[in-house]
Amino acid sequence: MRYNRFLVMKRFRLPGYLLLLFLLACISTLSARRPNAIIIFTDDQGTVDMNCYGAKDLVTPNMDGLAKRGVRFTQFYSAAPVCSPSRVGLMTGRTPQHGGLNGNVPLDSVGMPSQQITIAEKMKTAGYATAHIGKWHLGHHKETVPNAQGFDHSFGHLVGCIDNYSHFFYWSGPNKHDLWRNGKEVFHNGEFFPDLMVKEAGEFIDKNKDQPFFIYFALNTPHYPYQGSPKWLEYYRDLPYPRNLYAAFLSTTDDRIGALLSEIENAGLTNDTIIIFQSDHGASEEVRAHKGGGSAGPHRGAKFSLYEGGIRVPAIISWPGNLPQNEVRNQIATGCDWFPTIMELCKIPAAEHEIDGKSLLPVINSKSARSAHKIFHWKSGNSVAVREGKWKLVMSGKKAELFDLPNDLGESRNLVKEHPEMVEKLRGKSAVYWQSVGQSK
């Protein structure tokens, strides 16, 4: 009888034991879920145009909040000083030269070669739901649009810039409507484009909150036309023109970034989501941008320029509970580096093809880690630049300028005559690089 009772007890214990194993397996699976990743990419934002970068006349609490919850970079460079090639660096982890697109995509061009492998393609292959929301500017033919480049979902405009209410291409005529959702033209006349972006992102997050997702949230702001909210236009009314118009538009942008972050919080995904923030390049001084408004702070130059004001940009990464918070990194890093960094953080196998980016995880985790790059090259029109360590050489035709950046942030003292050996060294390395990519300087 006692033996039979023992058997009965074992029979009742066994299901409980199996249940425990099942629960432990479920917990392990949940804890092993890979993080979501969102890249917030602003357009034409100046080098220091955030409070945390030293701006005293701007209200940017949401951008600053990301810095408080993450790591902020002080020597972060875009891959190029203009829109399209900068985005090539971000999307492919390759320099614009290796990515096949040196300048902005003209209307009669296909765009970035379709054989380039984007971060979205890698994420999608790894089981991520992928979305492009906002500006594209890497091609508007069927083989180069977002849905053909790894994005499950796409909403936004394909060319360089639009009016934020009519959604018409804002450049040379004839102006054309440019708002698309997954290859189909859609119309939201009178609705503010950044608001549409937040709404689209919120719906995508809600739909995919139970699986890992990747969102490329590419704002068309504060790129002209400056269309700040009335409350911010009033708030900044006493700032000098055109800073007042730019500032209002930037704070309007900050509001929408805050709205996006609220969507993540409301979904309960704040601690499960990597947020990366970067401007595509420096602020614009074009006529349509009222010849300025943005600030490079102590730096020289602006959009299109290879001086620091054209290529040194604000950049932040935040992942609460997993990465350092409220810390600053002074190492050199570039927009090409987000590709391998995200791959490592999301535990996705590294790219099998050659990329130029380096994972920033060692730098993110330690202020004493070495810079990701010993040397980096840029090109804009007929000008090229190379930085190695503290030295930067800018060349245009026969003109050469050598700067000691840590001691000359404004690039005002040309040291060509004082350090001819460094000029020749960097000139030689530059020549080798441009020959390797099949381009002359």
Located regions from the model:
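Formylglycine-dependent sulfatase
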Residues: 10-15, 28-400, 405-441
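Bacterial N-terminal signal peptides
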Residues: 17-26
